[in-house]
Amino acid sequence: MSEIVFRRAGPQDVALVAAITDAAYAKWVPVIGRKPKPMTADYHAAIRDHLVELAYLDDAAVGLIELITAADHLLLENIAVDPAAHGQGIGRRLMQRVEQHAIEMGLPVVRLYTNKAFATNLGFYRRLGYAIEREEPYKEGFTVYFAKAVGKP
């Protein structure tokens, strides 16, 4: 596989970020009966206020991460892989990038959350060493919160 190259998203990338996110999350609409939260996000604000990085493979945008820095952890607000690029290890590489950012920022923990109905996501995060911290009701389902220690406290 070619090397994945990362680039910070700018205001010119709002439509691209939204398109990758919509493509990645579209399969979940029939599962939960509505658009998942990332499909309704304000990506103008996200790009302005958070670290949003696009992942490129062979000059094509294939995924993204959106990170929010907190005092004691790095929150993965969104991760999305273009369905056309599935099966190439891009999701795993994006997660490595998230953890790398946390370590470089001196943050000891990466946190994330997902819908409990997204079974493949739950398994993916568990395989990467993320542990469930808690579950909370959200709309008609539950949100599952994960965390992983990645650096020194």
Regions found by a protein language model. Give the residues of each.
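C-terminal "cap" of GNAT-fold acetyltransferases
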Residues: 44, 52-53, 108-131, 135-153
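Conserved GNAT-fold acetyl-CoA-binding loop/helix
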Residues: 18-49
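Conserved beta-strand in the GNAT
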Residues: 54, 60-68, 75-80
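A short beta-loop-alpha structural element at the N-terminal edge
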Residues: 4-19
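A short, glycine- and basic residue-enriched loop/turn
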Residues: 64, 68-73, 87, 115, ...
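Conserved acetyl-CoA-binding loop-helix of GNAT-fold acetyltransferases
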Residues: 81, 87-100, 126-127
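Alpha-helical elements of Rossmann-like donor-binding domains used by nucleotide-donor carbohydrate transfer enzymes
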Residues: 16-20, 42, 93, 97, ...
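Hydrophobic adenine-recognition pocket in adenosine-nucleotide-binding enzymes
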Residues: 9, 79-81, 114
